[in-house]
Regions:
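Conserved "HGTGT" condensation-loop signature of ketosynthase/thiolase-family condensing enzymes
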Residues: 1-139
């Protein structure tokens, strides 16, 4: 989880966005005990007690892990949620590990004013981790 926490912190710093401005999280969420525990520890480290207050979404329960394309798919889903102010439900996430403290949207899409979102992706074999902050620009 250390690389994920570093990527999250660097993305927030590069975007000049404090963690308390983020209103949508898009964790990778493999659905496997060890990977999810490491990822949850990273998100908990960066977002602290606020983690359980921020809506979260993941595409993993709907489409699984898609190799190198997973990050691009998650980015597209995150941008779409931001543009539509609608958070899609995270399928097959009804029993997440309580230690993760993610607040996944369940069952139906949720309308929400989203201005800043964070998505993360990493290689399951290790070595590559990326996080992006997406910000809505008002015209």
């Amino acid at each position: 989880g250390r690389a994920i926490a570093i990527a999250l912190r660097k993305a927030l710093a590069d975007a000049e966005t404090p963690a308390d401005r983020v209103d949508l999280l898009a964790p990778f969420g493999t659905g496997t005990r060890n990977y999810d525990a490491a990822e949850a520890a990273a998100w908990n480290e960066v977002f602290g007690s606020r983690l359980s207050e921020i809506p979260a979404m993941t595409t993993r329960g709907a489409i699984g892990v898609n190799g190198a394309g997973t990050g691009a798919i998650d980015f597209a889903a995150t941008v779409t949620a931001l543009a539509r102010n609608t958070i899609p439900p995270s399928l097959n996430t009804s029993n997440p590990d309580p230690a993760s403290r993610f607040r996944f949207v369940q069952d139906d899409p949720k309308d929400a004013r989203i201005t800043h979102a964070v998505t993360v992706s990493y290689a399951l074999a290790g070595g590559q981790t990326a996080a992006l902050v997406v910000r809505k620009v008002e015209e």
